[in-house]
Amino acid sequence: MTPQQKSAAHLPLLYNPFLNCIFNNPYYNKAPFKQTIEELARNHNDFTILVPPAHVLHHCYDPATELSSHKVLLRELCYNNEEFIRSHIIRTGTSYSSTITPISKVQSVIYNTMSGKQVLFKNGMVFMGKGFKRSLKLNVLSFQYFSSFCDYFPKGSKFMILYVEDCLIGSFDPHQHLSRIPQDDETSSQRSVSQQEVQDSITFEKLLRSFPLLSKAVSERFYRLFHHNNHQFRVLRINTRKKLEHIRIEFHSMLDEAYKIIQDSIKVENPDSEQTYNIINHILSIYPGLDLNRLVHDYVELNLYDKLWAQLLFQYNYPNDDKQSYDPEAVKFLTAETYNRLSCLALNQLDIPIFKPWQINTLQEKVALAIEEFSKLADSSIVNSTAKTKIIINTVNILSDLKSGSDFVMDADVLIGLLIMVIVHSKIDNLEAHLYYIKNFSAIDYSGDGHFNYIMSNLDAVLFHLSSSLSDELSDLIVHSQQNFEFWSAIQQGDVDAAKTMLDEVHENYVGKEIPSSHYLKSKNINGESCIMFAIKAKNFSIYDMLINEHPNWFSIDELLFDKNIITNQNLVMVALADECPEIATDLVNVILSSATKEEQVAYFNSVDNAGRSVGHYLFHNYKLMGILGDIIDWELKDLNSHTPLFSICRCYDHPNYPTLISEAFACVYQKYGGENINFDKHIDKSGNTLLHIILKNIPESQLLSRKENLISVNQQSSKYMTPLTLYVKYYRLENLKDLLQDNRLDFLLEDSKNCYNVFDYFGFSSMKSTIPNETFKKIESLIFGFYIDNFLPKVDCKKLFSLNAKYDQNKRDWFIFFRDSDGISNHKSLEMLKQIIYFIKLDNPCTYLPDKDVVWLNYGLGSTTPYFHKYRINRLIDTLNLFFTGLLYRNGNCYFERFLETGRDRERSTLDFIQEASLRQEKKRANLGVVKLKSSQIDEIEFFLTFAISDLYKYKDALHKFGKLSAIADMKQTDIRTVYLSALKKLVDREGNYTDELKSKVPVEAEIQDSCWGGFHSYVFWLQISLDELLKSVNKILEEIRTWKELYSSIRELNSELHQIEEKSPSNNNGGSLSRRSTFSIEPIPELDFEDDTTSAFFNFSNIIESKKARYKKLLMTKSEKVKQIMKLNVDIKWEHEVVASEISSFLKFRCDFLRFGVKTYVNSETKRIRNNSIELRKLLRDVKNNGKSYRK
């Protein structure tokens, strides 16, 4: 085993077997991993890993072995099956196919896996395609970067991983499989109901369309039967006076003719009879129990209804002068005038022996529902007897249906009284015609149906009561209706004098007596509204006061408690609050509190209307009542919009006393529940908005954040993926933003789980709006950027630069990164431009520990096709850029930051121009050193310093390498630990059967708990590593140059020695032709003795050279000249680079301390914040478990 394998083998195992086999595998260079690992290592940005949950891999089996005696766990496939591994790694560098729907903007992308299979991503789902044995659809739970810590992947590489809900090949759990018991009885029942529904939907017209041969056999004769030229049945087409019996006989004659058409089609005389007979038998076999006669009847009725109904209306609306003698059945009693005279008739005036208020309410509700159903008779779509009959039956069933536990009996008298109310108030015109049609034109013979006959007899009795035959009874009803009308009108019109006159009369007539239940004072309209309700709606306290306070004995407390609008289910206090009658509302509350028991008070004030709202939901109309009703109101009661009373109060944005409203409401809640018993999760609406989301201002008055007992999440996302922070920025809630930024639980840079938007993205969206409140916007801008500078950047004395967010430009097909400095100057650059700027910065600063440009772009491929998480990758690139800027701050980053804030003036210049300018600047710096002369001793000193420094740096590198690995794996292990912990907690909750599904759902799953803070700290460690690598690269470069210098120096010494020997042997030339190194190099001669001083100039001290060795001499001299030039250049390079590197080493020693200290500070802040938030979540779970246990024991 190689050292690398040993180091990898000793790292802790990851809880997820799939991740462990890829990133923590000591046998990575062996089958079945070798090829996969090599491909990932070559270009990790081109791949995305789909990771199944750990609990699935540990506990579920390969579905291919489901029927086998030897079942294979999925985790074993992770280590033994190459196909399994490669099927979960997709190539996202290039897509097979990509489409986008213009309207919904839903993007679908097809990718290939490493094994050549295909998967489709669409709308947050992944679908198995070509190559997979099973067609599965899996949810994408989350996505994130995985920091590699092994040696066989590039240092600092991060892999994109997607958590999916299951393996791509599927899985099965034998324990769950055994627990699934098929519900045969239920399935059979559902199938029976389904067949009955299909059979009921069949019509004769559908059969004719579905079976052309049947249509061919009968359609022509039916056409002739219904044709307007058919004189045999012309009676139905002529609007003349005739008896109803004649119409009925004519219809049945046509019906008999229709039956005859069917019978004739199967007679032997008909050549197609056998074929038609077989078709009919086939239809009956498909739909067993089908009544063909009923279908034919309905078909005839469908074709004749308009004519039949027109005939009936003509007869019933004919003047009643002689109808009693001509045709008594055609008399019309219920005219528009009769309906109008009875329009204010009340239920209590029909001699119904029911007096308890709650029973009356029940009957009122039944009547209202029955009227709604009965009114359908007037609908033009009701065109047959079946539909009419169904309406009649449903109406009576509504009236007759008694709830379990009901304490009164529905006898015939009560039913007739209720039917009178239904008929009078539904005001169906030509009701007699409808009833005649039902009795005489029905497809079903109801003569033996007792229930139906009972219904019709009751309807006949009602018509009898409302006819002129009983003039006294009808007159009484009309009188009651008129009295109600006059009394209610006086109240509704605010006529206090008229109302007082009528009430004084009542007082005089019933002094010391009980007012009869049938009196108009006790009457209620069809909506169940009493005279008290009318007074409240009229906002007339005087009339209300006369009814309630001047005559307190007229209405019992039960009558007040059950006085409500049965349509809206709003009681008296609700209406008083909703209609903003504070005086009446206060008096009503005092009357109820003084007269009702505690149980009655709780039941009354927490009863709900049709919108699910109680009195508490309306208290914002009169917040002064909160102090009185605070202990009675159920503040956690939700309406149909999932708004609690407290939530509704927080949404009263237009309330003139909003601060007081908030203060009073929360004070009541804290007083009633106290401690940690307040469950703020119960105050979340359907859209996932918490109280923090919805509150407009005055957070300090609410104590939501300041009260230590409040278990509230300040980072909770709504269903629109907005946190309170992003919502405050989007809707300019400046006051709330100030308060929230002071909370130490706030995750300022939290990204939403769908679009990866953070607070800067929402600020960017707001800045693009055309109408922005200028001053407020500027203050918000100052707040959020000031907060970022104070909390996410080191406190150094120089300008600070940071990147905010990114936007994709469709036209330029590139992302643009937005920047801002601490002075408020902002700019944006494309990714291509950024790449050049970072490259130029490094080019301008060689031999420094600034990371290379490739490191910044290590985990971001510019050409990668990753539509589902491209924003996530851009955000991580922004994190890297901010880390880069943070590193520059410790180098006085002002000179570097200017490039990022430059406008477009440099865009016309080419990359080559920048490179040439950088080279010229470097040459100029070297030229400023002048002639550099380095002695061997100086070189030795430089070498000694660098050797000592590099030794120390390598030791630090080894420690940093280990630290980097530990911080990387700690990122995953911390998440693993919490995953296992919460998994155990979930099992504990599941094992106790008394816990609700809502409570079980609060335990997170693996993909929801990637909240380790070690990943952020690892980035700082990695940045130190790459900075140190750059510094070591520069030191090694100088040491290599020193080695080259020494080699050149040794070569020159040898050349100098040989030249010296030649000069000594050369005779003197009297005519001035002696060889001289002075004339060759044009430098000052250096004495021979100084040669041993090891200076470069000593090489140019030449003596006389003999003429015969001149050629040899020149050759050596040229060689030496080249080497001297090289060593002179090295002198400049070594001196300049040594000065730079020495400065960089000194700077790095300070940088590594400050930078790592800031990294530790950032980690500690993040970790303490995480611990605070996790502590709140666990305390909430513990509270819910305790409360759930208490409820179960009760």
Swiss-Prot record:
GO terms for biological process: early endosome to late endosome transport. GO terms for molecular function: guanyl-nucleotide exchange factor activity; SNARE binding. GO terms for cellular component: early endosome; late endosome; plasma membrane; transport vesicle; tubular endosome. It holds the Pfam family VPS9. InterPro entries: Ankyrin_rpt-contain_sf (IPR036770), UPF0507/Ank_repeat_27 (IPR051248), VPS9 (IPR003123), VPS9_dom_sf (IPR037191). Residues 324-475 form the VPS9 domain. SUPFAM superfamilies: Ankyrin repeat, VPS9 domain. Belongs to the UPF0507 family. This is UPF0507 protein PICST_55861. The lineage of its organism: Eukaryota, Fungi, Dikarya, Ascomycota, Saccharomycotina.
